[in-house]
A protein has these predicted regions:
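Short amphipathic C-terminal alpha-helix that caps PH/PH-like domains
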Residues: 1, 53, 57, 103-111
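An aromatic/glycine/proline-enriched structural segment found at the starts
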Residues: 1-41
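M16 family metallopeptidases and their MPP-like homologs
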Residues: 32-43, 66-170, 187-195
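Active/ligand-binding-proximal structured segments within catalytic/core domains
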Residues: 36, 45-58
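Periplasmic-binding protein-like
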Residues: 61-64
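Short, exposed beta-strand-loop hairpins at the edges of beta-sheets
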Residues: 180-182
Length: 195
């Protein structure tokens, strides 16, 4: 059995926001980079359902911003879990004139309404596509060593990666709806604009 986690490198404290944060950094560049997100405390056991929720949100938000509106090409929109926190965020680069169009949309994009009417088939398709990519990444010996090593280092459990993927396989539509209702409301959002 692994010893208790006492590695100074991975012990961390998190920013505790009690008010929204807005940072606007003038840079004079030809591109503007935007980050918007919010942090939620989460319950143990919700990690896999939050991953599935993040994957679904990513597909829907990126389709809206990139394909329907044509306002960004390279972007990220998802949730990231670390310890007992989840960061729901959108990050992208765009033309400077698009920043004022996009910023007001972020809260409504990263919300329950974006999910719309999901089916169990939608959830399973999204999870299976992700699992397929993850299995492909783990084919080579060097990548297997990487995932075992990072699981041991960051989680103090060498098989954490495999256990997480197994938990993700078991996520259902009910789980996704439950965590969406529980966590998907922006409070004290962080907005960062680098122009």
């Amino acid at each position: 059995k692994s010893p208790a986690k006492t590695y100074p490198l991975t012990d961390k404290s998190y920013l505790k926001l009690d008010t929204p944060v807005y940072v606007d950094v003038p840079g004079g560049g030809e591109r503007t980079y935007l980050f918007w997100g919010f942090v939620k405390n989460i319950d143990r056991g919700d990690e896999a359902a939050l991953k599935a929720l993040g994957l679904i949100l990513s597909d829907k938000i990126i389709f809206d911003v990139r394909e329907k509106q044509g306002l960004a090409y390279r972007m990220t929109a998802t949730s990231a879990v670390r310890d007992d926190k989840a960061l729901f965020y959108i990050s992208l680069g765009t033309r400077p004139q698009n920043a004022e169009v996009l910023l007001p949309q972020f809260e409504s994009l990263m919300s329950r309404q974006t999910l719309g009417e999901l089916s169990e088939e939608d959830v399973q398709k999204t999870i299976n596509m992700y699992l397929g990519r993850m299995m492909f990444r783990r084919l080579s010996s060097i990548n297997q060593a990487y995932y075992l090593g990072t699981s041991l280092f960051f989680e103090n459990e060498m098989n954490h990666d495999k256990a997480f993927l197994d938990a993700l396989k078991a996520v259902t539509l009910e789980d996704v709806n439950r965590v969406a209702d529980k966590y998907l409301s922006a409070e004290n959002a962080i907005s960062i604009v680098v122009r």
